[in-house]
Amino acid sequence: MLATKTKPMIVSMGPHHPSMHGVLRLIVTLDGENVIDCEPILGYLHRGMEKIAENRTIVQYLPYVTRWDYLATMFTEAITVNAPEKLTNIQVPKRASYIRMIMLELSRVASHLLWLGPFMADIGAQTPFFYILREREMIYDLFEAATGMRMMHNYFRIGGVAVDLPYGWIDKCLDFCDYFLPKVNEYERLITNNPIFLKRVEGIGIIGKEEAINWGLSGPMLRASGVQWDLRKVDHYECYDELDWQIQWQKEGDSLARYLVRIGEMKESIKIIQQALKSIPGGPYENLEARRLQRGKKSEWNNFEYQFISKKPSPTFKLPKQEHYIRVEAPKGELGVFLIGDDSVFPWRWKIRPPGFINLQILPQLVKGMKLADIMTILGSIDIIMGEVDR
């Protein structure tokens, strides 16, 4: 019998299309169908977001931040206004805080929905993809009614939000919550006990509790490994403490556990939204003191005073000479910003801590020794957005 000597084969997976897992390239070393090594190549979507922040005022920078994680844009906006608010100690009115909380949780549901669809499509189940688009469209309709934009909302402002909720919006949102909860249960009936689905995800990509902490994982990746850590409970930001909700977690640490955590989070988010809508207080939707506008010189037009309203300068809002790290619980994990001010209107340093980038580091270790087909399952369960990974 002749022994055949096989050399390991090196395959380049990607760069994928932006609509799938973003422009991520994996250089995979294969022995037959077993993965020996995997090296992620990043940087195809690098746009220098941290450097751009250093020569923009906070308000000028707001439209840029929605391009990090472009499926959960409310969170990037929240962190961008929270950082200077904490640095300069600006109080946010209660109504504004509630509006922010509702928007953040709607954004979380939309993000998890758009994780679930492609994840199931990767495994081979095409149907849920069309279901989730139907529900996600409704969330985007709510966003459009409140902010004017479906995706890049540009809604948060320093000291509050841009505009109040329109008349009838709260009822529409409550209707959506009543419609959506049975739909999540329908997803669970379709997916969770499906034998083919379970074969593809059970025991695939296991991360232990210690390992998850040592790798610095956060979000559903960490909570699926048995760590009950949610920044909404830990950091007590906005008004989450006033509502009744539970941290979703699992102890198995495999791809199935990560799926279950995200499904549970969608239900909890709807619970939070319902409570917030029912107990939203009145009052102002922004802190007017935060709008320290520099009065622009009025331009003369045909000898009478005429001011272009839209040409008012950005708020010349000085960041004091301090440094501060602020974080929020984004759908993918801990999204943080380390901000250093130096007494000017521009930040001196704006360091972004993206959850996707740090969660992705564990991928090579998870896929070693697995089959080639399991790479997509594991990559899908991590939930990355390359705009945020590459910045």
Curated annotation (Swiss-Prot):
Pfam families: Complex1_49kDa. NCBIfam families: NuoD, PRK06075.1, PRK07415.1. It is a peripheral membrane protein. NDH is composed of at least 16 different subunits, 5 of which are encoded in the nucleus. It is an enzyme of class 7 (translocase). Keywords: Chloroplast, Membrane, NAD, NADP, Plastid, Plastoquinone, Quinone, Thylakoid, Translocase, Transport. The lineage of its organism: Eukaryota, Viridiplantae, Streptophyta, Embryophyta, Bryophyta. InterPro entries: NADH_Q_OxRdtase_suD, NADH_UbQ_OxRdtase_49kDa_CS, NDH1_su_D/H, NiFe-Hase_large. Belongs to the complex I 49 kDa subunit family. It comes from the Eukaryota. It is found in: Plastid, Chloroplast thylakoid membrane. One of its GO terms (cellular component) is chloroplast thylakoid membrane. GO terms for biological process: photosynthesis, light reaction. This is NAD(P)H-quinone oxidoreductase subunit H, chloroplastic. It comes from Physcomitrium patens. NDH shuttles electrons from NAD(P)H:plastoquinone, via FMN and iron-sulfur (Fe-S) centers, to quinones in the photosynthetic chain and possibly in a chloroplast respiratory chain. The immediate electron acceptor for the enzyme in this species is believed to be plastoquinone. Couples the redox reaction to proton translocation, and thus conserves the redox energy in a proton gradient. Its EC number is 7.1.1.-.
